Every structure is written in C-alpha cells, then in structure tokens.
Design a protein with these regions (language model features):
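Eukaryotic intrinsically disordered, low-complexity regulatory linkers and tails enriched in Ser/Thr/Pro
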Residues: 1-63
Length: 63
C-alpha cells in the first residue's frame, strides 16, 4: 500500500491509498474530487486534476 499525502480544502493533512481511488474529477476553482466509491468516501483537495493524477500515478509506478 502506497499512501499519497494531500491537503484537503479545509487545510487538513489527508493520506490517500492510491490503489483505492475510483475516480478523480475537476470540481472547479482549482479543486479536485477524489472518490473512493461512495458519497461519504470523497476528499476534496486544492490542486488541479493534472497534479492529483500525477501524484497518484507516481505512487502507483513507485511500488
């Protein structure tokens, strides 16, 4: 399991298991949604979709 550190929109440090992310999407205004399979299992971060995707892909490749 490879954890990726993000800061959520509330300024809290959040660690995400890159293997468990179902999808990411642009939420507007530089915010990105990371979804893990349900409405309650969603994290919003102040990063572009490209930056989030890069961090998650890097974690997946660096196994």
């Amino acid at each position: 399991m490879k954890l990726v550190r993000f800061e959520d929109i509330h300024g809290n440090e959040t660690f995400v298991n890159a293997e468990r992310v179902n999808f990411i999407s642009d939420f507007g205004s530089g915010k990105t949604e990371l979804n893990f399979g349900g409405k309650e299992a969603t994290v919003y971060v102040e990063m572009s979709v490209a930056a989030v995707a890069k961090a998650l892909l890097k974690a997946a490749v660096d196994k």
